[in-house]
Amino acid sequence: MDSNFIFGIGAFTAIVLVLAVVILIAKSKLVDSGDITISINDDPSKAITLPAGGKLLGALASKGIFVSSACGGGGSCGQCRVKVKSGGGEILPTELSHISKKEAKEGWRLSCQVNVKSSMDVELPEEVFGVKKWECTVISNDNKATFIKELKLAIPEGEEVPFRAGGYIQIEAEPHTVAYKDFDIPEEYHEDWDKFNLWRYVSKVDEHIIRAYSMASYPEEKGIIMLNVRIATPPPRNPNVPPGQMSSYIWSLKPGDKVTISGPFGEFFAKDTDAEMVFIGGGAGMAPMRSHIFDQLKRLHSKRKISFWYGARSKREMFYVEDFDQLQAENPNFTWHVALSDPLPEDNWDGYTGFIHNVLYENYLKNHEAPEDCEYYMCGPPVMNAAVIKMLEDLGVEHENILLDDFGG
């Protein structure tokens, strides 16, 4: 046999062996294996040990430590921020839209993006350790508007969710398939569903998902959690976009069904001051508005001046009307106002019309002695939020007095 041929085979074999060794070494460095320890808040009693692999958000959850993640770990909400002191690797490009360069230098990361490859040292907010999971039972799931349901859940007997008004919970769903044609929707709301043929949609989810929803209930409504959930249907101009996964799941729920939630979470809390409170809402942004206003007037018996400005398309989209009318009758410091952007002829509407930010300005803030001294709490569709914020900035309101809940619209 030719010596050059034999030499070539030998050289090739040697190269393959060297590459195999390099790959094995790299694998030992880069690929998850073995158990690792996550030290938490410099407290040995809080440290957890678990197999390497996955993301930090999931690793913590597997040990009963639930960090807020409105998007369910997709990296889009920026809520799951933790400080990683060591062991987290370099910050990823997907995190930089939520974390500034200064924060990155301080160790802030999105826990849903941090790979658990080696032992690490992290710092978590203390309130995280008060977060729990509950398996709840659906009490009711009724339409309050064309695209909004009120989901009412019973907490297990003897348990309570120690939340503050304006807080939120996370709701979970296992893989499932939901057909819109099976939704229970009263006849009065069928017009738009028929118009856009929404009954044709099917939501198929192949993985476990988590989403956040603001609570409509307030702390003295014991034993229940109440949500206002807007169905995320595909936009009319792009009907082939998949429908919202979690909202479709929630709309399919029926009394007696079991639902897993975790919480409480939140930062959209009322300030403890005597300043006037102006609440501005639209759509499913009603949820935290109801929670806050009921808490102020029914639990705290607040004497602060409070007004609520809510935007809807037509009378069919108005809800909790009797509740707010009663609060207004019982509390001289509270008024509430609705503006319809597209009232129907049969509405016979003689109230405010137009967009809520314009109505609020023209009919109240324009002639207010000191709008910059009020506190503004808002939750609604992104377009509404942006319009209200610009209007308030033009009036000289400082950012610290503009409080926004991004979840409810």
Curated annotation (Swiss-Prot):
Compartments where located: Cell inner membrane
GO MF annotation terms: 2 iron, 2 sulfur cluster binding; electron transfer activity; metal ion binding; oxidoreductase activity, acting on NAD(P)H, quinone or similar compound as acceptor
Record's GO cellular component terms: plasma membrane
Keyword Cell cycle assigned: no
Keyword Transmembrane tagged: yes
Chemical reaction(s) catalysed: a ubiquinone + n Na(+)(in) + NADH + H(+) = a ubiquinol + n Na(+)(out) + NAD(+)
Listed cofactors: [2Fe-2S] cluster; FAD
Signal peptide region: none
SUPFAM superfamilies registered for this protein in UniProt: 2Fe-2S ferredoxin-like (SSF54292), Ferredoxin reductase-like, C-terminal NADP-linked domain (SSF52343), Riboflavin synthase domain-like (SSF63380)
Swiss-Prot/TrEMBL keywords: 2Fe-2S, Cell inner membrane, Cell membrane, FAD, Flavoprotein, Ion transport, Iron, Iron-sulfur, Membrane, Metal-binding, NAD, Sodium, Sodium transport, Translocase, Transmembrane, Transmembrane helix, Transport, Ubiquinone
Chief location bin: membrane
Class in the EC hierarchy, top level: translocase
Positions of transmembrane segments: 5-25
Stretches assigned to the 2Fe-2S ferredoxin-type domain: 34-128
Source species, domain of life: Bacteria
Residues reported to bind [2Fe-2S] cluster: C71, C77, C80, C112
Entry-linked InterPro entries: 2Fe-2S_ferredoxin-like_sf, 2Fe-2S_ferredoxin-type, Beta-grasp_dom_sf, Cbr1-like_FAD-bd_dom, FAD-bd_FR_type, FNR_nucleotide-bd, NqrF, OxRdtase_FAD/NAD-bd
UniProt topology in membrane: Single-pass membrane protein
PANTHER family tied to this protein: NA(+)-TRANSLOCATING NADH-QUINONE REDUCTASE SUBUNIT, NAD(P)H-FLAVIN REDUCTASE
Subunit composition and interactions: Composed of six subunits; NqrA, NqrB, NqrC, NqrD, NqrE and NqrF.
Function according to Swiss-Prot or TrEMBL: NQR complex catalyzes the reduction of ubiquinone-1 to ubiquinol by two successive reactions, coupled with the transport of Na(+) ions from the cytoplasm to the periplasm. The first step is catalyzed by NqrF, which accepts electrons from NADH and reduces ubiquinone-1 to ubisemiquinone by a one-electron transfer pathway.
Family, as annotated: Belongs to the NqrF family.
Protein name in UniProt: Na(+)-translocating NADH-quinone reductase subunit F
Organism of derivation: Actinobacillus succinogenes (strain ATCC 55618 / DSM 22257 / CCUG 43843 / 130Z)
